[in-house]
Amino acid sequence: MLVPVLTLLGTLTATGTLVYHFDERLPVVRFRLLTTFLVLSSGQLLLYALWKVFLKPLCFSPFKHLPKPPLDQWPLWRDHEDGQRGGRAQVGIIHCRGILNGERLIVSSPTALAKIASDNYTFIKPMAIKLLAGRVLGMGLVLTERDEHKQQRKLFLPPFAPKHIRDLYPTFWRKSREVTERMGDEIHATGAGNGVFEIGEWAARVALDIITLSTMGKDFGSVRDADAPLAKVYHTVLQPTLGHVVIAVLKNFLPARLVEALPLRSNRHQGDAYDTIRGVCRDLLREKKDQLAGHHLGGKDILSVCLRYEDIAGVDEEEVINQMTTILGAGHETISVGITWAIYMLCLHRDWQARLREEVRATLPSPDRAQESASSADVERMPLMRAFLEEVLRWYPPIPMTMREPLVDTELDGQYVPRGTRIVVPIKAINREERYWGPDAKRFSPSRWLKNDREFNPSGGVSSKYGYLSFMHGPRSCVASEFARAEMACVVSAWVGRFDLDLSDEHFRDEENMRTSNGNFSGKPLEGLYVRAQVLEGW
């Protein structure tokens, strides 16, 4: 809230004092209680706003001496990479201002990032992020904090262990085959030998099917039907609309319940989505629990694995549902965005497209051979694909930035940081910094992830792990990072093996023309990614 509760209580106290003790002596209070309260509270509001918006940030800020980006202020949705680049990123901490001169620190030095990552239960996500995303993602691992997050991570990390992810490769490949065949059918139906697809939509459909099958053992048929109920729900609430931005801004200044009660279309969509998603998760959880009680829960999906862990089987139903909604929402959205950017970079770097096609066809079974599946061992034998996807994740991280706030007064690189200061971690910008990646940091180069041009190099040559933040580090690192890499490898391999892919609009051949939705849940092409796909025989 913009005006602290204590300020309003002080106003009430002052009002009572003036009205009942000085009623006849002061003209201002002759209008009695309500008018006096309004006059005093308006004056206090004005003084508080003057202090908060102008005096404190402009005259009394502890950050006045820090370097600033050229414009010093951005709209909420602006990509912080621009500000960091203009504000001499190498210094490590940059001062900027947000809405109503709200102070921000953009942090990029390895020591500051290490402190934020290792002391992550002191540096928490701002409440505004939780209020914006909580209805869709649920209060799971992505949004919970401190002891609650620590307990959840301890419980739900084991089901994402590599041995369980390896068991899911047949599911990843089966759905990759299905979406490839579906796209091929649409191309053949045109009779033109090629077709134009909005890759972001197709990536979201296959990612949703993969995540529901892999995590809950249920196929919702999004690949077969773009209007499948669950697909429509996520398509609606995860679109980067102005309504979502308006709600996010309002929740910074007004109670969340009040904002959610406003008659806005985005509110209605998010409310309906909340009920639908949680209802689906609740039904599937109860179905799995019934199977567990009957001693015939044998699936390899994540939920089945979770329930076979005794510690998780006894967890409250609502907590498990929170984790399921988090996995569904955050998982399928970020992975589909990663796939979308991978296809974009294949269109821009057609030499790599040809190299990857050759590797895929030599390693993986054709999608036409339904009885054969890809395995984790197959993917590990594709160093070019692994290098390419890792560079895509560096170049276009699905979450291009994140924010933190310290719970207590602290220091970063010797700079005093009061509690509640908004700290921006510009993931996309850090991933491209020369201090971490060398002189070719701002060049898309999958070869940095290769040794001798054929052996995969998992470090990519980065000088510090804090120079590569696509999956973060420390207690808040992504528990499903290997899941995401495996799914991306399967889908991209199936597409590049079967299709020749190129942009349908040459305007986007220049990356500067590709605007991204950096103010939403993820950073994806704002206007979609339309790609012309042509079926290539021989696989």
Swiss-Prot record:
Gene name of the encoded protein: buaD
Protein keywords: Antibiotic biosynthesis, Glycoprotein, Heme, Iron, Metal-binding, Monooxygenase, Oxidoreductase, Signal
Entry-linked Pfam families: p450
CDD domains: CYP_FUM15-like
Signal peptide (residue range): 1-16
EC number: 1.-.-.-
Lineage: Eukaryota, Fungi, Dikarya, Ascomycota, Pezizomycotina
Cofactor(s) required for function per UniProt: heme
Top EC class, one word: oxidoreductase
Its job: Cytochrome P450 monooxygenase; part of the gene cluster that mediates the biosynthesis of burnettramic acids, an unusual class of bolaamphiphilic pyrrolizidinediones that display potent antibacterial, antifungal, and cytotoxic activities. The first step of the biosynthesis of burnettramic acids is the hydroxylation of proline by the proline hydroxylase buaE to generate 4-hydroxyproline.
Domain of life: Eukaryota
GO process annotations (BP): antibiotic biosynthetic process
Organism expressing this protein natively: Petromyces alliaceus
Pathway(s) per entry: Mycotoxin biosynthesis
Family: Belongs to the cytochrome P450 family.
Annotated positions binding heme: C478
TM region positions: none
Name of the protein: Cytochrome P450 monooxygenase buaD
The keyword Metal-binding belongs to this UniProt entry's keyword annotation: yes
Gene3D superfamilies to which the protein is assigned, alphabetical: Cytochrome P450
GO molecular function, one term: oxidoreductase activity, acting on paired donors, with incorporation or reduction of molecular oxygen
InterPro entries for this protein: Cyt_P450, Cyt_P450_E_grp-IV, Cyt_P450_sf, Cytochrome_P450_monoxygenase
Glycan-linked positions: N120, N520
